[in-house]
């Protein structure tokens, strides 16, 4: 099936929603994270099941225990509803979480099952289910390259 130009724009806008989510959670940017969800949206994320904006606030404290995180998203599958205002999708995710107080890297593998809604000209998540595939923790060993000359990442808006 071919897409119209408007449908292609909708698909790209939905992909941008996923990017906003990842950037918001990785930078501990509450407003950016909330901007991925409608205020009346919901999220089922492990032990948290409820309002998506409350989930965003939950993430701010939950993710503060790591030095930095990287939510890497890929394999987007998006199905647009014929009404032009609803879509469903699946997004694969591998998250790298660097522990704050130990030289340990936690890696999380999973998928997001999303329901999107378009209001006006804007797409956001209406409902998300986070599916866990696997996790691992491993000690971090130094690489052979000198990384001291690079700007070091952290959980904030600037790096």
Where in the sequence are the language-model features?
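Short, low-complexity N-terminal intrinsically disordered segments enriched in polar/charged residues
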Residues: 1-23, 27, 31-36
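Flexible, active-site-adjacent loop/turn segments at secondary-structure boundaries
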Residues: 3-6, 46, 106
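Acidic side chains
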Residues: 10, 26-29, 43, 114, ...
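A solvent-exposed, acidic/Ser-Thr-rich amphipathic alpha-helical stretch
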Residues: 27-95
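A beta-strand edge to alpha-helix "cap/lid" segment located at domain peripheries
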Residues: 64-159
């Amino acid at each position: 099936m071919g897409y119209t130009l408007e449908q292609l724009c909708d698909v790209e806008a939905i992909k941008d929603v996923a990017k906003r989510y990842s950037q918001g959670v990785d930078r501990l940017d509450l407003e950016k994270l909330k901007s991925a969800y409608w205020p009346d949206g919901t999220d089922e994320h492990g032990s948290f099941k409820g309002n998506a904006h409350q989930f965003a606030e939950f993430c701010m404290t939950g993710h503060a225990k790591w030095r930095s995180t990287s939510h890497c998203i890929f394999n987007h599958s998006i199905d647009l509803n014929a009404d032009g205002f609803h879509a469903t999708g699946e997004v694969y995710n591998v998250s790298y979480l660097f522990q704050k107080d130990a030289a340990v890297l936690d890696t999380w593998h999973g998928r997001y099952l999303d329901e999107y809604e378009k209001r006006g000209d804007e797409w956001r998540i209406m409902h998300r289910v986070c599916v866990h595939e696997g996790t691992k923790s491993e000690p971090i060993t130094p690489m052979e390259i000198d990384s001291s000359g690079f700007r070091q990442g952290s959980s904030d808006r600037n790096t």
